[in-house]
């Protein structure tokens, strides 16, 4: 046993260290590498020196029963004394089976947890550490509190593959990792805590003890608001990368609190309902944008502490802004300190690279056929809602989870039990995650980034769906951008590209997304996808944004689009805020602001987004003129007419059939001079006439500016 202790290879330290139940063995054994002496300290009694048993072992052979007695140890470190509680006197370090296997409670018990244990009538505060490493032959806790010496604090093998140890008097902010021996006794790289709530950056990547109970939330009004049906709400998401929205004068990151001070008033002014953060889970490589996470339970410390991130969410909520996080359950990186070969085995991924390795991203794929892995991920999703009060998660790369042959050639994948390409384990996990989120957090939303035609992504699980609240409309994004990039003179040949998305617009609960994916890897900015000279580019962009806000579906724009950013997104720099010195870009920003407020204030533009009753074509086949028109209809019967002219040719005396007799009042014109448009005179109040057009008995006459979208309300 001494040899195992000296090699940090002991799996049952409580059988050898601490107080003995059998007094014939002695009263106490202490293992303290590097100590020159150890003494027993009992309250109100003289100290008793322990004998040196081996090089690092000390034993007390006095006739004392310390099994139920609280005691301390006076450690002599070459003349420097340290008074500590012996962790091996605390046997009550386990938790109930259900607590360790139920996703809603797992994160309250695994990892490092502040707790108080009772011993000899005394309440002893400290931190309990639990880690799942079923194939390890030994696990030690190492950290700044023991000079990263794996011999000092061997952990006890408990049931169900879990190892545990309680360290008395350990404070918040202490760095730690796990030192393990693999199945054959081989040494492994120090591992960060998979359940760690806080982590250090390069080079240590160590986990840090953190107490969730300390932060005092101020968002009770937001958290207790009535449960609403999100499909009927106006949802406008501002997708944001925390490290590159703005920088300080030195070019450094804003921390979470500084970001809150700058961003929250901006979101309120611009009319966004939610901020959608690209992944904030701890990730070692900044250039991954967060999509290679190692610490799923820790908000990245690049921008501050977990308390600072809570402050950010709190500030958003107090201003009426919801917070959605990108969540990455599809894969994880191969960093030595992370989940890869965690206990010396592929604990979190399939050992067969055809199922366990993502060749495009050079990362491991979670083995969702393992119950513990599924529980780990579902627990993580619930954790962010519970501990950080987030309002939604956008699940990254869902298609890569659903299909076993995703981005794989013949022979590079293994079929399921029925010979097909669907990943049954991933499907079951996603369904379970959605059910758990909506069960415990009924006001939450889950959003899928899913790029295929997999059926029922946003259908309830009881109807056979995956159970997501919404799905990104990747088809709309692809088709609409493909259309708008064409020169106006060529758009008539691509008219179906613009109208086709309406064929399936209500097959899912869609979010129309112009995300970060469209402004990276040489794709350029949204602004610079537009054809023509500078004025035409901006006019096209304004018309396109108007078209987007008039279409059925919730809205998402990546940061920078709202100011007409011309450069491709660069994560190493802030947005091109200097562009707001120019009227054209001021106009794009002003238009985005007005579109958000219009979308939120007009029920017809959002409350039937997800059902066919909210949309009617008025003009869909005017390919030669590159004009489309439709009406959006609210539950209460309100109607808003949206007309887009995608050529630089103004249309005077343009007659359009309408189903209702009445007046159509102008709500918004993307070509308005206040948006740096041409200021072409438009009809402000169009009264219907009994003139047949488009097979409708009534019609109105409009003036359509070049490259524009107009919104009219029937009154």
From Swiss-Prot:
It comes from Vibrio vulnificus (strain CMCP6). PANTHER family: 1,4-ALPHA-GLUCAN-BRANCHING ENZYME. It is an enzyme of class 2 (transferase). GO terms for cellular component: cytosol. The lineage of its organism: Bacteria, Pseudomonadati, Pseudomonadota, Gammaproteobacteria, Vibrionales. It comes from the Bacteria. Monomer. Catalyzes the formation of the alpha-1,6-glucosidic linkages in glycogen by scission of a 1,4-alpha-linked oligosaccharide from growing alpha-1,4-glucan chains and the subsequent attachment of the oligosaccharide to the alpha-1,6 position. Belongs to the glycosyl hydrolase 13 family. GlgB subfamily. It catalyses: Transfers a segment of a (1->4)-alpha-D-glucan chain to a primary hydroxy group in a similar glucan chain. GO terms for molecular function: 1,4-alpha-glucan branching enzyme activity; cation binding; hydrolase activity, hydrolyzing O-glycosyl compounds. This is 1,4-alpha-glucan branching enzyme GlgB. Its EC number is 2.4.1.18. Pathway: Glycan biosynthesis; glycogen biosynthesis. The active site is at 396 (nucleophile), 449 (proton donor). InterPro entries: A-amylase/branching_C, Branching_enzy, GlgB, GlgB_N, GlgB_N_E_set_prok, Glyco_hydro_13_cat_dom, Glyco_hydro_13_N, Glyco_hydro_b. Keywords: Carbohydrate metabolism, Glycogen biosynthesis, Glycogen metabolism, Glycosyltransferase, Transferase. It holds the Pfam family Alpha-amylase_C.
